[in-house]
Design a protein with these regions (language model features):
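Alpha-helical transmembrane segments and their immediate juxtamembrane cytosolic regions
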Residues: 1-196
Length: 196
């Protein structure tokens, strides 16, 4: 009620006599863009709340003794640089291959299931890595490998980006180039999160 309303007011400044005239409309709770109620760039706060609520059963399980075998298996699979880079990336890409054809736009509202699941994967894997001391240490021990991988994936990402800007030309259909760009972007996102 403090950060976002000035942004909405500025977008509709010609419709109101002043800020306080506008601010009253925020409490009508009419969703943006028809109304003045929105989370705008604070969408991630609602997403984090929903992820936390949806994953409560997983949080409880991962902290219980029943998860010992699961954690050992996950630790074994994800503790190598290749495992920690590729397994989560492939899962993230798989979710997007299924969802993005139906939810292609990044709107950050509650009907944006494609990007909601995309960011939830990051949240889930973050919890998974943090919950296992060996995995957490493996990230630190393999930081150089992770950095090299993150830098390496920038090459195809920017080549494809430059194609869209007309600097580089590829002979493939635009749909193929957009798909490759999205895939390299997902790899780059996960690799960068692990590196940082």
């Amino acid at each position: 009620f403090v950060v976002v309303p000035p942004q909405i007011y500025y977008e509709h400044i010609a419709e109101y006599t002043g800020y306080f005239d506008f601010y009253k409309t925020v409490f009508n709770f009419v969703p943006y863009p028809e109304g003045s109620f929105s989370w705008h760039h604070l969408w991630f706060i609602l997403y984090l709340l929903l992820y936390s609520l949806l994953l409560i059963p997983f949080f409880n399980y991962i902290r219980s003794e029943r998860s010992e075998k699961f954690r050992a298996t996950v630790s074994r699979w994800l503790s190598s640089p290749a495992g920690m880079l590729l397994i989560p990336s492939v899962i993230i890409i798989f979710t997007q291959a299924i969802l993005r054809p139906y939810f292609p736009d990044e709107t950050h509202d509650l009907t944006d299931l494609g990007f909601f699941v995309f960011y939830m994967c990051f949240f889930f894997f973050g919890v998974l890595f943090y919950s296992d001391r060996n995995l957490w240490l493996a990230i630190g021990q393999n930081r150089k490998h992770l950095l090299v991988a993150a830098l390496f994936v920038l090459i195809p990402f920017y080549l494809l980006y430059f194609h869209f800007r007309g600097i580089v030309t590829f002979p493939w259909p635009e749909d193929t180039i957009e798909t490759l760009f999205d895939i390299t972007g997902m790899f780059m996102s996960w690799f960068t999160v692990l590196t940082v």
